Amino acid sequence: MKRMLINATQKEELRVALVDGQRLFDLDIESPGHEQKKANIYKGKITRVEPSLEAAFVDYGAERHGFLPLKEIAREYFPDDYVFQGRPNIRDILVEGQEVIVQVNKEERGNKGAALTTFVSLAGSYLVLMPNNPRAGGISRRIEGDERTELKEALSSLDVPDGVGLIVRTAGVGKSPEELQWDLKVLLHHWEAIKQASQSRPAPFLIHQESDVIVRAIRDYLRRDIGEILIDSPKIFEKAKEHIKLVRPDFINRVKLYQGEVPLFSHYQIESQIESAFQREVRLPSGGSIVIDVTEALTAIDINSARSTRGGDIEETALNTNLEAADEIARQLRLRDLGGLVVIDFIDMTPIRHQREVENRIRDAVRPDRARIQISRISRFGLLEMSRQRLSPSLGESSHHICPRCQGTGKVRDNESLSLSILRLLEEEALKENTKQVHTIVPVQIASYLLNEKRKAISNIEKRHNVDIIVAPNEAMETPHFSVFRLRDGEEVNELSYNLAKIHCAQDENTEESLLSRNVETTAVIEQPAVESAVVALSISEAAPTPVERKSNEPSLLAKIIAKIKGLFATKSEENKPKNNRTSRNPNRNQRRSQDRRSSRRPRSENNETERTEEQVRNVRERNQRRPRRNLVEESIAESAVNSTPVFEAKEERTEPVTQRRQRRDLRKRVRVEDNETVVENNFSTTEKMPEVDVITVQNNDEKPVHQNQRSERQERQRRTPRHLRAANNQRRRRDQEPKSPMPLFAAVVSPELASGKAWIDYSTVNLPKENHFLSVDELLEQEKTKKGFITPAMGIVVEEKSPDVKPALDFITQPANESVQKKVQESLDRLSSYKPQEVVESIDPAINVDEPETLEKVSKFVRTYEFNGRLGTISSVPHTKAEMTLAKANDEMPEDFPIRAWQDSRYYFYGKGAAGHHCAISHVYSEPTRTKSE
């Protein structure tokens, strides 16, 4: 049987334990000095708005300011006329000095302040009230099946005010609508008291404090499976009995006072189990152990097999140890109330089925936990990651403090290493200008090491830097701590060395930080909430309605058997009736839960959103109707032009062709009609007057097949124009479409059109005649025969006024300025032709006529005297120049004689291992660095 044990014999600590038999499975400890602030309601003041973080910092009365993100700001704090698109700007919503009602969402942890929210939630016995969050609400995720449907019906019958959200807790299962309505009435009355108290005085102050551990334990842990509540303090027993009588009268008979001689927790043998929650290492029944280390980022858990010998082989031993560790880890997480990221290093298991078995075991073990837990699979490194919701400060945070000696690291530096570090720090302080004395306050062990083993080093520092170093031991100081003070000229202290520790300690106590911390300690007064609790605020004469015992409608055993037999012969229609079980629920519940459904998430107001959606729908409908209407009008006009008979009857019989959603764009159209509405109006006007119809529409209809024929002839694939060309209203350039310059240029001159790319030159390839420089032997012999046979007389040749092979570029404008260039080129060609043999003299002059005899000259007969005696082959007609090979001049340098010397032994000798190096040398030679000289 499960029991709730409440130990309140010591006023400094109140403990609540939940046991199943003699096994502890949940624990809650609260001290008067460590009350949790979570769920407390404060009236705070905005001190700073940070747009980069999308958050504001709130002074709510604590030492550190709270953190209020933008998503946690309720809609009621937005200005009335504030309209935004996308994400709102936090500077437009909150201003510095504004007062807000906030609730602590997460406790302070380390250097982080508390996380706050303006969406207040008040927890009752059966319900959770969210007064300013109407979108939130529902039923607890732990409630399933028929119980869930019953609670939905009960919720629908409740009288809930507008703008209020409700969540039904697991304790509300099986409660009547009257009991739920009573709990709602208590919570609403409590919220009214909170609003009245917030207007009583200015911020910051505490409005509502979360209930103490007794009320909280009764509210959170009191379930139907708890059979007994034992309390060992008469005062706490009376308080708990009154509270249970008011909120849960059906549990009044289960509250009992423990009066045994043996302490309550020792009677059920759970003291040793509670002590295991404070230890770093926890033993397993098989002999293994788990080691739990809490860090700033995560909680690391390591599993060691140690002396575990369960199993026949190593794989079975690892599996059994991991299964035991999975149960114990889930239990320790509840006892220690560890939250955040948890990483478990299981013993390596090779079979995949063993890994899945361990994963399933840990999922089953964490199922009774109140916190939300997410578990991943075991990775290839043997690690399992899981996250646990942080409900309250962990057991270590609430009952432990950081060690003043090691600062929470658990390790202390070695004496010798610490002494050498202090020695280096002393020399750094002595190096500073205007230093007269350096004082160091160290523990006794460090002072002994510095004044004996390192005496020479301290004296050398004093001589080099001309300072005085004083080492003063302090008995109250422990190893890792020390202090170094630097005194300038005129600040010398003429005190005895053993009094320096007291003097410097007194100076440290008078610093600003120490005075501030002492003021905080003296002024720290426990705040009293303006509203004590819902029970105190309400003067309700009547308690919660007692649950009416319902007559069990369960049939007898015989009736069940008969019903089962009938069920076998029932029709299929009865089987297909929907059942209210978990499978009928929305499978996307987790996704819906992850979304924040608060009003701050809606970026636009409802009015603007509805207006915009209506406009969008109207525009889409009009756009879809324009094209079919225009096509119908054009077709009707064309038919009316061909046939004089009315077209309306045929129009009804003819099926309209379905227009494509996206037609191909015809790139050959040069004129586009953008105003569709005007076209439709004109077409409608033409349909009214049938005799005035023109044939223009028929021509438009004939255009389409012409383009289609052209496409079929060319057989080219049209691709969609890229987006960057469509934006610039350009077209894709084809291969056959050569770019033509809109502004022809006669030469590649520098012009703004050419530089900007508006004009370009046609660089089409010109096929020049190839000159054959190499002749075969036959061709060469034929040329020689023709030369021997006859001598051609010199004749005048009439040349037309055309440039022989040079043609102007297309779209070029020839100018007279180019004629002089051509004449100069022609003169240079004539000059080169004069070097040929004087057989034929050709005078190429376009101005000479044929009839003039002055151009004729007589040439003497050419007699060949050359005889060929070599080999026949391909002979090049291109002249070649040859030159003899030359040698590069070299300087006359005589090589020097290489000196030959006898080998000489070294003066240094090696004396064996450990005798080498600078510190073991007999003599040393030093030389100053030299600089290379440049000639």
UniProtKB/Swiss-Prot annotation:
EC number(s) from the headed UniProt entry: 3.1.26.12
Entry-linked PROSITE patterns: S1 (PS50126)
Membrane topology per record: Peripheral membrane protein
Keyword annotations: Cell inner membrane, Cell membrane, Cytoplasm, Endonuclease, Hydrolase, Magnesium, Membrane, Metal-binding, Nuclease, RNA-binding, rRNA processing, rRNA-binding, tRNA processing, Zinc
Region of interest: Required for zinc-mediated homotetramerization and catalytic activity: 403-406
Needed co-factor(s): Zn(2+); Mg(2+)
Binding site for Zn(2+): C403, C406
Compositionally biased intervals (Basic and acidic residues): 593-625, 701-719
EC top class, as a word: hydrolase
Biased composition (Basic residues): 720-734
Cofactor binding annotation: Binds 2 Zn(2+) ions per homotetramer. Binds 1 Mg(2+) ion per subunit.
Catalysed reaction equations from the record: Endonucleolytic cleavage of single-stranded RNA in A- and U-rich regions
SMART domains: S1
Family assignment from sequence similarity: Belongs to the RNase E/G family. RNase E subfamily.
PANTHER family: RIBONUCLEASE, RIBONUCLEASE E_G-LIKE PROTEIN, CHLOROPLASTIC
Protein name stated in the entry: Ribonuclease E
Protein source organism: Haemophilus influenzae (strain ATCC 51907 / DSM 11121 / KW20 / Rd)
Gene it is expressed from: rne
